[in-house]
Amino acid sequence: MKRPNFLFIMTDTQATNMVGCYSGKPLNTQNIDSLAAEGIRFNSAYICSPVCTPARAGLFTGIYANQSGPWTNNVAPGKNISTMGRYFKDAGYHTCYIGKWHLDGHDYFGTGECPPEWDADYWFDGANYLSELTEKEISLWRNGLNSVEDLQANHIDETFTWAHRISNRAVDFLQQPARAEEPFLMVVSYDEPHHPFTCPVEYLEKYADFYYDLGEKAQDDLANKPEHHRLWAQAMPSPVGDDGLYHHPLYFACNDFVDDQIGRVINALTPEQRENTWVIYTSDHGEMMGAHKLISKGAAMYDDITRIPLIIRSPQGERRQVDTPVSHIDLLPTMMALADIEKPEILPGENILAVKEPRGVMVEFNRYEIEHDSFGGFIPVRCWVTDDFKLVLNLFTSDELYDRRNDLNEMHNLIDDIRFADVRRKMHDALLDYMDKIRDPFRSYQWSLRPWRKDARPRWMGAFRPRPQDGYSPVVRDYDTGLPTQGVKVEEKKQKF
């Protein structure tokens, strides 16, 4: 049987609130909306972490960033960590990655060097884009194109943008003669609609008078929320007033523009390619936009930044919606199942096209960036999302519990409401079990000893859990015996010399 191709499209800073088919807002995302109408739309898809590098690490390695290494921005995965590209290349796929990477441990723009598992002829990270610009153009791109007048005065059209040049390369790849018996995996990774929001002037003109109504989320006084949320709001004041209207023409214009670029790539699939290509679209995280008095993204688990669009279009054209919570951690296992690639033990995710039972998913946060102390520096957070509730453990401050059925805007923190004692206990146990399962290196007894959990007992005292097999690394050997490990054991603490 002919193995399928994969076209994997992702954006940056585009949660469900920025996509028309999810939000119901007039955001002109017709190409994404059309993809949703033709495919499978996941309504409760969550990222691994609400910050760029850790989010991407989870997506492209299939394990959480706390395991793979980049638990904060500008840290690279460990040398023994395999990626989507490696798994698929070794399975005989032509693997191509075009656009923003943000996983090499360097700065925002990357080094421009293509990892060996991807096709170097198409690699186009931020550093590669910068190499095509003059110093004046670089300065304009980062800080000088903030109005209609700026765009007009500098004659900026779509050919100037990183997004357009990414799409050009993707279209070129699709137009190349097919390699006999070699299916492809092409990742198209846009920086847009992330800052600096560069797009042609005609897009910006459309949003001069557009205001996004945040509703009651703009009125959250954070009185029953964790202290670090209030400190964040004080340090980075929201631009939203009492009317609850968010005005950011550049952001909405760039959001519109990247949708058109996505359309260019999807429409470049030939009829023959479409018959055998899975198209996957998602984003790495969202933007608070002033909801809950917060801007940007960071140490919070609100849906505004953690619930992202996820759409999968099959070659057969299956159409449905899925409300069960799923995670970016599930995407690599799902793709491997479709490609008939054996999933290694180390990947905790599941094939989300086959999930039928209720389940929970985890989201984590540890630190925004290694270079600076945004959002308070080290703020360890773990979140567990089910069909009905969301539990958030903020290790250094207070916790949160939200009713996902009756409080869509996450205004009412129920963590101290005794009526939900059984709910929070079960969710707490499930989260701790999952942290145990994935070998979260930040696990400690403080996660279990929460002030609202009177029956809590310390966990993780002495157990040894070897690294699961990844399909590449040698077996893990037991320290005491020197032989291959036989799973979890509880060590007897005694002097060994």
Please tell me what each predicted stretch does.
Residues 1-390, 399, 408-429, 461-497:
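Formylglycine-dependent sulfatase
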Residues 392-394:
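Short beta-strand micro-motifs enriched in acidic
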Residues 417-461:
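A contiguous, mid-protein "functional segment" used to position or interact
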Residues 405:
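Residues forming the ATP-binding cleft of Hanks-type serine/threonine protein kinase domains
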